[in-house]
C-alpha cells in the first residue's frame, strides 16, 4: 500500500513538473524590424534561445538576453544577417525539456515595401522581417475569398527570408492575409492605370493595366455620368466603352473597380473634319466641312461660333459658323490675295474652344467636282451641285462622253450649281462630266428617262399646300399606279392625286398635299418601278425694311419688319450681318430685332430660316468718330489712326499732308489707318476728312528729338568721331559742336542710329578757361564736355563727349604746344618722383646704419674673447712641458 502511494505521488510530481516547465499562456511577444523580445509573467518558465530547423543546411539558434524583474524579459537585437536566418520548418525552445514554439508566440511579419500585385496575378516581390518565421510554402488570403499566395524557392539553400518571390492568384481591390499568429495583414492589388485613350465615333477604347477581369464590377463615369454595365466590356488591360460625344469638349473620366479608384484622367473629344469642298483660287468662296464633333457644347449659338477657328494652311477662314454637330461653314478668301499661298495640299485645321483636330485633311484650290448624290431633274432641266464649276462661257459639258454645246448653261457666281435643259436626243441614262480650265471633273450617271416638274408655288411654313407635279416618260406598266413623294430628310410619304384626264398616258399631273415645313427639302418621286430625284423649297423669308433705333452713342437696336414665316420654325432662324451670324432675341412672324453692338457696320443684312435665305437688305449704319491718334510717328513717319464705331470697308475718308493724299486701310469696324511715310525732322500739319466730309480736322506730326547715347574715343589730335544714338535724320543740314566752340566737319549720315564727322585738333587758345594738365582737376581729360548735335529743327545737347588720355603723337606743328605742356608735366612728375626717392633713402639709412655699427662692435667683442682663451691655453701647455723636461 505504501509502495502504491509512493508511485502515485511520483507520477503526480512528474506531471506537475511537466506542466510548470511549459511557457505560461500569458507570455507575449513584442517585435519590430530590429528587435524581438518575449515577456514572461512572474514565476513562469522562460527560454533564452530559439532553435530554427531548415529544410536544407544547418539549424540556427537565436540567443536572448534575459532580465528578471516583475517577470522576465528576454530580448535580442535582430541584425540584417540574422534576419535572413530566423525561419525554419520547426522552431523550438528548451527549458527542462524541448518544446515546439506555439504559433501565437510568432512575431507578426513586417512588410517593409509596397505590396501591390498585378490584378492578373503572377510573380511579385515581398520584402520585410519575420515573413517566414515558420518555414512554409504559402500565405492564406481570407478576404474577399479564400486564395493562396505561394512562396517560391522556400526550400532552397539560397532562400532569403527578407526578400523573396511570391506567386499571386488573380484578384482585385482590397485583400486580407491571416498570419500564423492570428494577426491580419491588409493589402490591395494594383490600382488601375490608363496609358492610352482612343476615341472612335461610337466608342472609347481605354488601354492600360490592372482593370481587373470581368468577374469584378466597375464603376465608370464620364463627367460624373455613370456608364451602364451593358455599355462596356473589359479585361485586365483594356476597356471598350460604347459612348458617343457630338461636341468638341474636354471631359473627366474615372474608373473604379472593387473600390479601387484610378487617377481621374482628362479625355479630349477633338473635332474631326473628314470632308471639305474646293473653291476657285481666283474667287475663294464658301467652304463646307463635314465630319464629327464640329460644334461646341455652348448653348449660346453666337458664343459657339466665336470659339471656332478654321485655318487652311496659314490662312484663316473667316465667319466660321457651326451649322450642325457634323458641319461647319466659313468663307475662304481668294488665293491670289496672298502670293505665298500654294494651290494644293493645304492642311485643314479646325479649332473649337481651343481644341484642335489631330486628323489629317488636305484642301486643294480649284478641284472640279460634281456631286453624284445631289441633283434634281424638274422638267428635264438637270440641276447639278459641285465645286469649282467655272462659268457659263468657259465650262465644257460632256454628255455620254461627247462635248455638247448648251445654249442655256447656267452656273452661279460661286461656281457651286450648274443647270441646263437636257437635249431631246438623250432619253435614258446620261453620263455627265465637265471641264474647267483644262481640268476634267469626275463623271456621274443620271437616269433621265423618268423626270418631273412642279408648279412655281412654294410650300407654306404655316400649313399644308397642294403642289402639282407633272411626271414624264411613265412606263406603260405604271400607268395605273399611284405615285408618291418621299420627303427624304423626314422620310414622310405623300401619295398623289390625279388632276386631269390623261390624253397621253406617259405624261401625267398629280397633286400632292405637302405638309408645313421649313427650308429646302430633297424629295424622291416614285411611280411603280420608276423614280427620280427633285427638291422643293419652302417659303422664302422677305425683309421689307430695317433701321437703327434708339441709338444714344452707346446702346441701340436694329429692327426689321417683313414676312418671316411660321413662328414654330423661327427657332431655326438667324441673321447674317457684319460677318456674323446673329440669333435675334426678339422675333415673330413679321418683326425681329437685335442689339446694335460694337463691331457692326453698314452691310447687307440677310435673314435665313432653315437654310433658306431672304434677298439681302442694305442696312446703313452711320459711322461714329471718337478720335484720332498720330502718336506713333518715328523719324521716317508712321501710322495715323481714325478711331470710332461702325466703320465699313468702303467708308469715305482721307488724309492730306503737303498737298498729297494718302491711301486709307480698313483695319476693322473701329479703326482706319493711314501709312504716312514722311521723313522728318521738321514737324508738319496735315488734314483729314471723315465720312464724306462730315468730320474734318487738322493734326500735327511731331517727330521725335534725336537722342545721343555714346561716342567713339578720340584724343586731342582730333580725327574721325562716331556718334551713336537714336532718331537720327538723313538731312543735308547736320551740325555737330563740342563745347559750343569746336565744330565737327565732313559730317556723314550712316543710319538712323549713327553718324560720323571729322573733329579738328584741340587748340589751347580756344579753351582759355582750361589747362591741358593730365592730372589736374581742371584738365579737359577729367570731365565731359558739352556736345551739340542738330538735324535742322531738332537738336540734342548733353555733356557726353570726353577726350581720350591715350598717347598723343606729334603729327604737325599745331600740336607742339600741346606736346610741350605734356612733356613739362612728365618732367615735373619725374622731379617729384626723385624727391620722394631721396626721402625714402634717408629713412632707410637712418634705420640700417645703427644696426650695422652694433653688428661690428659685437663681432669685435667675440674676436677678443677668442684670443684671450687661446693665450690662456698656451700658457697652461708651457708649464706642463717644462715639468716633463725636468723629469
UniProtKB/Swiss-Prot annotation:
Alphabetical list of Pfam families matching this protein: Ig_TgrO1
Q: Tell me, which GO biological process terms does this entry list?
A: aggregation involved in sorocarp development; cell-cell adhesion via plasma-membrane adhesion molecules
Keyword field: Glycoprotein, Membrane, Repeat, Signal, Transmembrane, Transmembrane helix
Q: Where in the cell is it found?
A: Membrane
Q: Cytoplasmic face: residue ranges?
A: 867-887
S-S bonds: none
- Keyword Transport present in the record's keywords: the answer is no
Q: How does it sit in the membrane?
A: Single-pass type I membrane protein
Region (Disordered) location? 811-835
Q: Which residues form the IPT/TIG domain?
A: 277-365, 710-767
Q: Which residues lie on this side of the membrane: Extracellular?
A: 22-845
Q: Which CDD domains match?
A: IPT (cd00102)
Q: Where is the chain membrane-spanning?
A: 846-866
The signal peptide annotation in the UniProt record is 1-21
Residues bearing glycans? 32, 70, 186, 207, 219, 259, 297, 314, 325, 338, 354, 393, 431, 588, 629, 652, 687, 710, 720, 730, 775, 788, 811, 816
- Listed GO CC annotations: external side of plasma membrane
- Which superkingdom is the protein from? Eukaryota
Q: Which InterPro entries match?
A: Dictyostelium_Tiger, Ig_E-set
Name of the protein: Tiger protein O1
Instruction: Supply the gene name.
Output: tgrO1
